[in-house]
Amino acid sequence: MSTEEPQADEEDEDLQYFVRIGQTDLDGTKSVERALTDMNGIGRRVARIIAEKAEVDRRDVLGALDEEKIDDVVAAVEEYGDEVPEWLTNHQKDFFTGETTHEIGNDLQMSRRQDINRMKKIDAYRGVRHKRGQKVRGQRTKSTGRTEGTIGVNVEAIKEEQAEDGGDEE
């Protein structure tokens, strides 16, 4: 056997397979950028910014980082909303508080659900569309977004039904 294989095993021992950040278990075998995108509210652009703020190479494997670097990443995730411009956040001008925040994980899901429920309650146009289960953002609905499995009109079946109905009456 070669001497390289034990070194690979030693690297695997140092690797954390799950890294917990903000109520989310992240895959430690992925790069920092890719692992952070598994969190709700963090996309590729935000993940790059967080990696820069934490002074970590975005291509490094997340589970191979030492505890200090992981703590830096956690701190960068928590402080992200305070350090970036307003247009880079995901929850701008909250209805009740007027604050601009960047929400992550369950907080983001709850705030979106509350916003939709408020729109439904006051019967705003978007709220009515949400109630009816229709498209909200102005997409066409005549031909796209159909939920039924039927395709077109079967003219022959309609003619047969009319012939049967007409034959019974005579």
Swiss-Prot record:
Disulfide bonds: none annotated. Residues 128-140 have a biased composition (Basic residues). Located at the top of the head of the 30S subunit, it contacts several helices of the 16S rRNA. In the 70S ribosome it contacts the 23S rRNA (bridge B1a) and protein L5 of the 50S subunit (bridge B1b), connecting the 2 subunits; these bridges are implicated in subunit movement. It comes from Natronomonas pharaonis (strain ATCC 35678 / DSM 2160 / CIP 103997 / JCM 8858 / NBRC 14720 / NCIMB 2260 / Gabara) (Halobacterium pharaonis). Residues 128-170 are annotated as: Disordered. It comes from the Archaea. Keywords: Ribonucleoprotein, Ribosomal protein, RNA-binding, rRNA-binding. GO terms for cellular component: cytosol; small ribosomal subunit. Belongs to the universal ribosomal protein uS13 family. The keyword RNA-binding applies. This is Small ribosomal subunit protein uS13. One of its GO terms (biological process) is translation. InterPro entries: Rbsml_uS13_C, Ribosomal_uS13, Ribosomal_uS13-like_H2TH, Ribosomal_uS13_archaeal, Ribosomal_uS13_CS. GO terms for molecular function: rRNA binding; structural constituent of ribosome.
